[in-house]
A protein has these predicted regions:
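Short strand-turn segments of transmembrane beta-barrel domains in outer membranes
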Residues: 246-250, 258-268, 277-308, 320-337
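Short, acidic Ser/Thr/Gly-rich low-complexity loop/linker segments typical of extracellular
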Residues: 92-104
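Outer-membrane beta-barrel translocator domains and adjoining extracellular loop/strand segments
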Residues: 330-335, 363, 368-377, 413-416, ...
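Short, acidic, small-residue-rich periplasmic hinge/interaction motif at the N-terminus
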Residues: 35, 41-90, 120-125, 135-187, ...
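Transmembrane beta-barrel wall of Gram-negative outer-membrane proteins
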Residues: 298-324, 334-367, 386-415
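N-terminal export/assembly leaders
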Residues: 1-59, 95-98
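Extracellular loop and loop/strand-boundary signature of outer-membrane beta-barrel proteins
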Residues: 290-292, 330-334, 378-385, 394-398, ...
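Periplasmic N-terminal accessory/gating domains of Gram-negative outer-membrane beta-barrel systems
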Residues: 125, 131-143, 157-267, 278-284
């Protein structure tokens, strides 16, 4: 017998077909072909029904921009990778995974936006990295440190916490705060400079024209700058020209700088030669899976960056960034600020010998001011001309070797160079007097 719903089947429409030596399945398939109806056989009955067609909305047809989030989960004290830790996106817990034998994880097809990423593992406190920006232009790499969780057998309490006061340096107990480049980029009028961001903290006073900061009333020139654990000269363009301890623009581009520590109080014993505060900055590692390049043009300069793997199998990578000022192009004359800077980092992890890295930072600053026309002289400054030349270099070779779960050795061989030269002339009606 044949069963159907009369309201959904046009019984007035007739079909004439001829079959010979065919099965009932082939006959019904030919009969209902392109009619919008389907059938199914139950026992001795054939049931005919209207085909269920699901309409796709326009929003589902729209292809969303997605990107990949990669990273590593490590122990905050020993920096050793944590295997098989669970990683997920808090806004969508279904998107996530677990780390491999080297602590690496990968989450694919994440729509662009900002996300909070959580890592959890037995014996550790859940760790959350907040406000991770995902863009379509490049992969996101996140390092998630986790603290061991001491458990009482009578009671177990696991509580996720977002610790803004946790520093990159595990030896810092108090007086420090981690500054992420994400925070610096969102700070109004901050020029992506961690020093300008720090002026918003308690006990820190900033300057409008420079990135000089006075910490707890101490002079800005007593602030110590560190890069990859090595003390370096102030990595700021035109430093100390308008005021001691400050400069115009950070020489470290947002393309290369990673999470850094800022100390405005008591700091660990490893930081010496500092009376005010400490900026302990770090260069991030390049992408060891794919090549990525960036080109930025702004009012202050041109920024070129490139990163990618050196050897994918061994996990080695490179990262390089170069900036060149465009103020001379914008002004069209010789009274301007000219600067260049170059930063790079090469990372070479090994299975038995530890991790080797080579890094460097260099900056060149030039500033020339010509004297005004004689008819425009009103003050001593109008009669003056000057030329400033600043060159700074810093670089090193670093090695990190993990002895066991609680101990690792980090050693560095580095060199720094700094040279400042200033010339000033005073023009009179009869002569030019060199005053500096």
């Amino acid at each position: 017998s044949i069963a159907y719903e009369q309201s959904k089947l046009d019984i007035e429409k007739k079909h004439s077909l001829s079959f010979k030596n065919v099965t009932i399945d082939k006959a019904m398939a030919q009969l209902l072909k392109e009619t919008g109806y389907v059938y199914k056989i139950k026992g001795y009955h054939i049931i005919i029904s209207l085909q269920d067609i699901k309409q796709k909305t326009t929003s589902n047809d729209t292809q969303k921009l997605t990107q990949t989030i990669r990273g590593i989960v490590v122990d905050s004290k020993t920096n050793t990778p944590i295997e098989y830790a669970s990683v997920c996106i808090i806004e969508d817990p279904s998107r996530g995974g677990s780390t491999d034998g080297r602590g690496n994880f990968r989450i694919n097809n994440i729509p662009v936006g900002r996300y909070n990423i959580q890592a959890s593992f037995m014996g550790y406190r859940p760790s959350i990295i907040s406000e991770v920006s995902v863009t379509s232009s490049k992969e996101v790499f996140v390092e998630i440190p986790m603290d061991e969780n001491v458990q009482d057998l009578a009671e177990v309490l696991v509580k996720p916490e977002i610790k803004k006061d946790r520093t990159v340096n595990p030896m810092a107990i108090t007086g420090g705060r981690m500054i992420s480049i994400e925070e610096a980029s969102r700070f109004a009028n901050g020029f992506d400079d961690p020093a300008r961001l720090s002026s918003a903290f308690a006990g820190v006073a900033g300057d409008v024209g420079t990135n000089a900061v006075a910490i707890r009333g101490n002079a800005p020139q007593f602030t110590q700058w560190r890069l990859e654990g090595i003390e370096i000269p102030n990595p700021t363009h035109f430093a100390d020209l308008s005021g001691l301890g400050g400069g115009f623009l950070s020489a470290l581009s947002t393309q290369v700088i990673g999470n850094s520590d800022f100390y405005n109080g008591a700091f660990p014993a490893e930081y010496s030669n500092a009376l005010s505060g400490v900026f302990d900055m770090h260069l991030r590692n390049g992408n060891n899976q794919k090549y990525e390049h960036a080109f930025q043009v702004g009012l202050m300069g041109i920024d070129l960056a490139s990163e990618g793997p050196i050897n994918k199998k061994r996990g080695s990578s490179y990262l390089i960034n170069y900036r060149f000022s465009t103020t001379s192009l914008a002004s069209g004359n010789d009274i301007n600020l000219k600067y260049q800077d170059l930063a790079f980092k090469l990372n070479f992890p090994t299975r038995k010998a530890g991790t080797f890295s080579i890094w460097g930072l260099g900056l060149i600053d030039r500033n020339k001011a010509d004297v005004l026309e004689r008819s425009e002289w009103e003050t001593m400054g109008d009669r003056s001309s000057g030329y400033n030349k600043l060159d700074k270099l810093a670089g090193g070779l670093a090695h990190k070797y993990v002895l066991d779960e609680n101990t690792y050795i980090r050693s560095s061989l580095s060199a720094t160079y700094s040279k400042d030269r200033s010339l000033a002339d005073l023009h009179t009606d009869d002569a030019i007097i060199n005053v500096a």
